[in-house]
């Protein structure tokens, strides 16, 4: 009823405004910066675990073959999806040694999109919101 009362020009402008507003949201959820055709596994120490929306983050301190360390930012899904997979805000604590598998960044920097994690006592966690194995 409301749409039929609108002038065609107003309706077109409103539709265009909605379409333009949707582009940033789609870009925000893009995973184009990750190479989903590859996986990299690193062992490191949890520096920080951020349980936040819209994405949680793990920051791992990882040593290379020469003993040089780098901080690996690893992007996960949001808390809602992680909860359904058995995660909690206390799953990871600073100082915990873990093995993480990620889809690496395409640009070659350290970091990536979370695929799976092996905790110190052997339990493996995956994130279904990034199509990770369970």
Language-model features, listed with the residues they occupy:
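N-terminal secretory signal peptides that target proteins for export/translocation
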Residues: 1-8
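Bacterial N-terminal signal peptides
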Residues: 13-22
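Short boundary/loop segments of OB/S1/cold-shock single-stranded nucleic-acid-binding domains
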Residues: 26-40
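Conserved hydrophobic positions within beta-strands
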Residues: 44-46
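Short aromatic-glycine-enriched beta-strand elements
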Residues: 52-63
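Short, structured beta-strand/loop micro-motifs enriched in basic residues and often containing a Trp
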Residues: 76-84
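Short nucleic-acid-contacting surface segments enriched for D/E, G, S/T with interspersed K/R
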Residues: 84-99
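OB-fold/S1-family single-stranded nucleic acid-binding modules
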Residues: 105-129
